[in-house]
Amino acid sequence: MVKYKWSYLRILFFVIPILYGCSTPVSMIPPIREEPGIIIPRAILSEFDKFKVRRWKYIVIHHSASYKGSASSIDKYHRNIKGWENGLGYDFVIGNGRGSRDGQIEVGGRWNKQIKGAHAGDDEYNEYGVGICLIGNFEKNRPTRSQISSLVYLIKYLQRRCNIPKRNVIMHRDIKDTVCPGRRFPHYKLMARL
């Protein structure tokens, strides 16, 4: 009973408020692990569903192509090296334990402000695509189990919240000449879980 109570409280106090927008540019969500018997009460989700989100059509999956990192390190790179005024080009970043906790979902300022992304290299997908970046180089390694669990949770939430169909959950390579999110990314296994 205590285990389930903690899971319920974790969702109530950490996950739900952050997904519905906070005032800080990068927020953090504790890692979400698959645990049997966890049910997200509909009352909590419906309470926060009254917040308005802009029209989203796609979810675009990326990898950072780096061994380590976090939303703040990518934000710094995007601001200082690429010169992007709004910084972090993604809406969400999922950590691998090297730079941020394994499976930790970090929420970027673009999601909080509901503004256009800078992740797809294509106007349509930057404008209407929610960008999710997993830390790691999936040409060389696979994502961690915690990263995939958090990704599945986040995608399901976004599908429900933004009415995005499964066919519009796409890999960056589907829209741009790139290997992103890497050949070792378990695309088909991910799609089977959605």
Question: For the regions a protein language model found, what residue spans apply to each?
Answer:
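Basic/polar, cationic surfaces and motifs that engage anionic cell-wall
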Residues: 2, 22-60, 96-99, 104-107, ...
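Bacterial N-terminal signal peptides that target proteins for export
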Residues: 2-11
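Bacterial N-terminal signal peptides
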Residues: 10-20
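Secreted/periplasmic proteins that engage bacterial cell-wall peptidoglycan
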Residues: 51-110, 116
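Soluble, non-transmembrane domains of envelope/secretory-pathway proteins that act on or interact
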Residues: 114-125
